[in-house]
Amino acid sequence: MITVIQRTGSARVRVGGEVVGEIERGLVALVCAVHGDGSAQAQRLAERVLGYRVFPDAEGRMNGSALDLGCGVLAVPQFTLAADTRKGMRPSFGPAADPQTGQALFETFLEALRERATGPVASGVFGADMQVELVNDGPVTFWLEAPPRPAGPV
């Protein structure tokens, strides 16, 4: 699984003009499942998002995590992160998990966040046309992955 996280002062996501998810200080996580992902990747990615140290300490170094500080997480499903853009002028979404699998893994990711988070967890709606608003803090943006385990003996 893939996520792009952005540190934010506040963020919200709308569907059909209605706010469906909103947080104050925290992280926006754009989330995508790819072929071969399973619940282990969704849970590992949730752990990484919550534990990734992107918030400044008293000396200005990135030493605080959303988990440490009780910050919120706004999770937004975004299959376009799996795009293959290596050739041509049109992205290919072949690497993305099929919609049914993607939705199930997004829900597993959300459940894992909610089980572990010390702050609020909000989300967008899988498969919906969403409008995301955020106040980027920094800006601080990272690409995180929880790749599928390679096939073969363990």
From Swiss-Prot:
It comes from the Bacteria. It is an enzyme of class 3 (hydrolase). Its EC number is 3.1.1.96. GO terms for biological process: D-amino acid catabolic process. Pfam families: Tyr_Deacylase. A motif (Gly-cisPro motif, important for rejection of L-amino acids) lies at residues 138-139. It is found in: Cytoplasm. It catalyses: glycyl-tRNA(Ala) + H2O = tRNA(Ala) + glycine + H(+); a D-aminoacyl-tRNA + H2O = a tRNA + a D-alpha-amino acid + H(+). GO terms for cellular component: cytoplasm. Belongs to the DTD family. An aminoacyl-tRNA editing enzyme that deacylates mischarged D-aminoacyl-tRNAs. Also deacylates mischarged glycyl-tRNA(Ala), protecting cells against glycine mischarging by AlaRS. Acts via tRNA-based rather than protein-based catalysis; rejects L-amino acids rather than detecting D-amino acids in the active site. By recycling D-aminoacyl-tRNA to D-amino acids and free tRNA molecules, this enzyme counteracts the toxicity associated with the formation of D-aminoacyl-tRNA entities in vivo and helps enforce protein L-homochirality. A Gly-cisPro motif from one monomer fits into the active site of the other monomer to allow specific chiral rejection of L-amino acids. This is D-aminoacyl-tRNA deacylase. It comes from Halorhodospira halophila (strain DSM 244 / SL1) (Ectothiorhodospira halophila (strain DSM 244 / SL1)).
